[in-house]
């Protein structure tokens, strides 16, 4: 049975009950379908993932209002797919405590939802076939659309307008190539979100596109207390944050303690609030820095 350890409304009270409705009406099932109760069936394993990651079928009830409620007035019988990452399947990392990656996945969703970023599919804690872990609604990504957002091209084929070159290298045949990303407002929202949560692994494969939306996935190594921002989305480095982006950052900072107390430790929450303060004071997206590898590898 699916046992949701923390529903969307479990994180705080009062102001912390605000949802991403401030960013307009939800228009994608990955933002509105919250698994409530039911069974998880393993469909297959996603072998390319570094940790144990399973495609699952969830059969049972789910809330479709974006925020669960105790009386389940919004519940409907449903069958949907998700990505299940059991805690016991986490690979040890030298710089992140073992057994915390699933909580960080859920924390990233909560920041996205609460701040109104709407860039992370619904993610909850659940008891699955291999024990507790994170459970995220599956997004059927449109590969052609992703290619219009992040791409790998010959250096002499980098477009003059609408794209940012991020890093250059060499292909297997020693021909020069460049990683580029689009100057796209949806992608920029993901870049702002990553700067706030200190995402250490924004690869091209962690960017999905579906029904006009852009999503980020794989947030298990976010929220470190040290600066570990590592991303392909450096095209807006140093650019001024918009008032809408600043409002989202302030919203998260103001509600961070209640929002994330069950998911992150005090030092990690404090570091999040300090990053928010730094972004607000500077008013700009951060630049890459020299004391950390700022491009994920491999980039795709």
Named regions from a protein language model:
Residues 1:
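Non-catalytic, low-structured ubiquitin/UBL-interacting segments
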Residues 4, 97, 210-300:
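C-terminal catalytic region of ATP-dependent kinase domains
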Residues 7-26, 61-77:
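Intrinsically disordered, low-complexity terminal tails and inter-domain linkers enriched
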Residues 14-18, 140-169, 220-230, 281-300:
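Repeat-unit-sized solenoid/scaffold elements
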Residues 20, 30-35, 42:
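N-terminal, Lys/Arg-enriched amphipathic/low-complexity engagement segments
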Residues 36-171, 176, 192-200, 204, ...:
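Conserved ATP-binding subdomain of kinase catalytic cores across diverse folds
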Residues 101, 182-189, 200, 226:
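Short capping loops/turns at secondary-structure boundaries
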Residues 133-196, 233-243, 247-274, 279:
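ATP-dependent phospho-/nucleotidyl transfer catalytic cores
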